[in-house]
Amino acid sequence: MEAAPLRELFIMAVGIGGEAGEVQELLKKHVRDGLEIHDDLLLELGDVLHYLTRIATQFGFTLDQVMGANCEKIEARHAKRVARMEKAHA
């Protein structure tokens, strides 16, 4: 990867981390202080989605592909968990 795309990728990675931190802060204040966060949370989640979309696009993925792969991973994890539970109770 060339220097310019690498620099942009780094900025996007740091950006998504920062925005995820903003989401965490809002949720903390909501749980701890009862703060109403609905509108602010919508905006911060949009920022996370913005960076996620840019990273996915840089690697040639669509958001549908990302979600599909994630659903498959979660389903496989759930199936393994169920199999372990069934084995433990057999």
PLM segments and residue spans:
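Flexible "arm" and connector segments at domain edges
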Residues: 1-90
